[in-house]
Amino acid sequence: MDHKEVILLFLLLLKPGQGDSLDGYISTQGASLFSLTKKQLAAGGVSDCLAKCEGETDFVCRSFQYHSKEQQCVIMAENSKTSSIIRMRDVILFEKRVYLSECKTGIGNGYRGTMSRTKSGVACQKWGATFPHVPNYSPSTHPNEGLEENYCRNPDNDEQGPWCYTTDPDKRYDYCNIPECEEECMYCSGEKYEGKISKTMSGLDCQAWDSQSPHAHGYIPAKFPSKNLKMNYCRNPDGEPRPWCFTTDPTKRWEYCDIPRCTTPPPPPSPTYQCLKGRGENYRGTVSVTVSGKTCQRWSEQTPHRHNRTPENFPCKNLEENYCRNPDGETAPWCYTTDSQLRWEYCEIPSCESSASPDQSDSSVPPEEQTPVVQECYQSDGQSYRGTSSTTITGKKCQSWAAMFPHRHSKTPENFPDAGLEMNYCRNPDGDKGPWCYTTDPSVRWEYCNLKRCSETGGSVVELPTVSQEPSGPSDSETDCMYGNGKDYRGKTAVTAAGTPCQGWAAQEPHRHSIFTPQTNPRAGLEKNYCRNPDGDVNGPWCYTTNPRKLYDYCDIPLCASASSFECGKPQVEPKKCPGRVVGGCVANPHSWPWQISLRTRFTGQHFCGGTLIAPEWVLTAAHCLEKSSRPEFYKVILGAHEEYIRGLDVQEISVAKLILEPNNRDIALLKLSRPATITDKVIPACLPSPNYMVADRTICYITGWGETQGTFGAGRLKEAQLPVIENKVCNRVEYLNNRVKSTELCAGQLAGGVDSCQGDSGGPLVCFEKDKYILQGVTSWGLGCARPNKPGVYVRVSRFVDWIEREMRNN
């Protein structure tokens, strides 16, 4: 099930009023804790588990896990700080926040962390010990104060905070250096602030992060799971000097929040380096010259460039002298320059030579996203799969196998040298039912990958249909197959993938159950013992088994064949997806972007603009491309081409029958072709986005075109470039496009320059990968120059015009 379905099922398992209680827990799907002190109990839902954990008296319950299909609860004394985690299907682990936290709130009487040394570095005496000091406070005299081991605590509400008896015979007790939780104050620039302040400095209410009104934006909580973008609380997801929020005032897009700095010393910093590691956010060397040889401006000065990247605003970023630094999450260290004509530039920092161990893997730089659309498939259980897919079945990005963040694990290249654990590619190192990976979402430990098993004959993949092709009724019993995750599957398969017959849904032998029965789920098709998916499990239909030792297992239901040979957004040739340039030349694999068209004058045949095929009869382009003439017969469209000047057998040439300009003078236009294009493996439409969909900040997208290459190689052949989307809030900063970008536009580009769409690429596509297909998110519109540093390209935001596009296609 996708994230929304998981949340829905989760909420259904709660009783009224339990949501607030769970705020004190951190949940992780697919994670099970190895525990020695535990109780296994029957439970009807998460709320029952919660009550059992809170009411446990035999031991301190720090976590519990709920197994929905087993209707079982396991309450445990351990948590992920003290015990190892294993991956498991159909389980959600809940851990009490207070036992995971290493900070204090107020005077710290609720602190339950594991600090066990005093401010002076002396080890603490165990609270239950009587040597070298006989305690006044012990576990027996104060059983509710968390006096475990030798951890710092505050059982007497001391105003100076947590303390402990020391192991120094001459020092009875001393205080501990526990940092404040960033709830009512912030350290550094508030990157880790987790409080509930939700008003700006001027008193405006904050807009909820998951809302797109009144301000549409790209800081989507699901795309930034580690940024804690909850409710409408002030946060700092993008390297600003302090937390901020979008406001509920339509005339004020965003504003900083007034959050005080914490008064206690900040948590210990991460290791620092004299060389480049990752993005260089922990670089503390003394390079003070940019890549082009410009001397850096001092961070504390405001000439020749005024800025807010000051030592005062970024107190933890070591903005000393004029040394190159990366205070705001750029791709590398940089500095403002002393040249008044060049505001800032990256620096060239020598790379650290020693390779990181798995524990030291830099999680700040995720690997390049590998998103094969030409459907790779796997044989058998996928242990031999060595493809490059790195996307899960719900569209989440995979964590690198060598990384330990956000999920620590033992499935490393060192431990499984023959499993092909490269980068973050989907693999099956442990003989599971198919390739899987750990995810980059802290709340979802792992998922199976968005891959399909190769068919028994021919090795090809049975394609999944588009939404419009899904049947509304039950599957045809003669073609026992499923669509999507099989939630609507009504076939008659009644055996698991392992060959075990299914137990009837109404039966209570050999397994008793009460959640998934014909009575509790009358619309789920729980007939006889047929495989079904009543809970929307992402892994597909399942059943309780007739094996007394195996409660449930999944069924092997094939995907239904698509009614169409080619689906939108799915090329039949895998794109190169190189991080190279259009300017500078990165020649695309022929026909790997099959929606790309060349717009030409009908009489000279000269290419002058790009465009995107969005339906057999329709092309989307930029309105400014049609300034040459208002007559449709002036234009023609070339489809299926790779070479600009060479006509292959697969090239289609179609004249234009109608021009439709956007009525509010936005830079977007529709071309109706004089006849439908023939859809082939070399001519396939791109998919349109959902109306008003917002592309998340830093999403990797792709531009293509035959445009200006400024004398570099590759001219005349279709080129491509990989670009990150830049949130409009960032793009409109004074050092970039200075408030020129409208809400109906989006920015994308490498701020260092060198990668951009240029003259001749106008009107062409900017497509972004989403789960299993490419979506047309932008139409190339304008820019300040071509591939200039600090001047990203600007694209019409297609999602804002989907209603208009669909209406015009219907009416014409």
UniProtKB/Swiss-Prot annotation:
Role summary: Plasmin dissolves the fibrin of blood clots and acts as a proteolytic factor in a variety of other processes including embryonic development, tissue remodeling, tumor invasion, and inflammation. In ovulation, weakens the walls of the Graafian follicle. It activates the urokinase-type plasminogen activator, collagenases and several complement zymogens, such as C1, C4 and C5. Cleavage of fibronectin and laminin leads to cell detachment and apoptosis. Also cleaves fibrin, thrombospondin and von Willebrand factor. Its role in tissue remodeling and tumor invasion may be modulated by CSPG4. Angiostatin is an angiogenesis inhibitor that blocks neovascularization and growth of experimental primary and metastatic tumors in vivo.
Any one cellular-component term (Gene Ontology): extracellular region
Record field: catalytic activity: Preferential cleavage: Lys-|-Xaa > Arg-|-Xaa, higher selectivity than trypsin. Converts fibrin into soluble products
Gene3D superfamilies (alphabetical): Hepatocyte Growth Factor, Plasminogen Kringle 4, Trypsin-like serine proteases
The name this protein goes by in its record: Plasminogen
Known partners and oligomeric status: Interacts (both mature PLG and the angiostatin peptide) with AMOT and CSPG4. Interacts (via the Kringle domains) with HRG; the interaction tethers PLG to the cell surface and enhances its activation. Interacts (via Kringle 4 domain) with ADA; the interaction stimulates PLG activation when in complex with DPP4. Angiostatin: Interacts with ATP5F1A; the interaction inhibits most of the angiogenic effects of angiostatin.
Domain Peptidase S1: 582-810
Miscellaneous comment in the UniProt entry for this protein: Plasmin is inactivated by alpha-2-antiplasmin immediately after dissociation from the clot. In the presence of the inhibitor, the activation involves only cleavage after Arg-581, resulting in 2 chains held together by 2 disulfide bonds. Without the inhibitor, the activation also involves removal of the activation peptide.
One GO-annotated biological process of the protein: trans-synaptic signaling by BDNF, modulating synaptic transmission
Family classification: Belongs to the peptidase S1 family. Plasminogen subfamily.
